[in-house]
Amino acid sequence: SSTDAATLASLFSRPARGRAVPAWSLAADEAVVTALGNDVGFELIFSRQVIAHSRPMDIAIALSTSGNSDDLIVALTEAKKRGLLTIGFAGHSGGSMSTSTDVDYCFTIHSQSIHRIQESHARVGYRLWSVVQEQTQQRVADLMAAGPTNPGGSS
């Protein structure tokens, strides 16, 4: 799931086409992950990064093949507390991720096959990216059609 998170973050932040959207995987920096794990506990490695980096209007996405990864559940709880939109990608029956009130949307892949779950998470992630790109393009087109605005109000 860590590799899938890095791939999804890369798709948003460095797309082959379309607009880049700021995104990063909280598992990508081994030094931060191991320092937090050793100093405060591995169940807090992602929530501490949410505290440090999140801003209002951000989106937190967590990927877990079981849906029961404590470190991700704690991070999603922290993200929700901070006002972020929270999205879970889970497998099997969805685990605690699918029933948590701190998860706004949970995409559950009902399979016992880890590789099928991860393949499906990749497809759902790509579709999510596609929707963001479509909406962004439409918003830009709408703004362009509206023409320039006059913020000062004078003619």
Predicted regions and their residues:
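Glycine-rich phosphate-binding loops that contact phosphosugars or nucleotide phosphates
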Residues: 1-143
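A short, charged, Gly/Pro-tolerant segment at domain boundaries
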Residues: 140-155
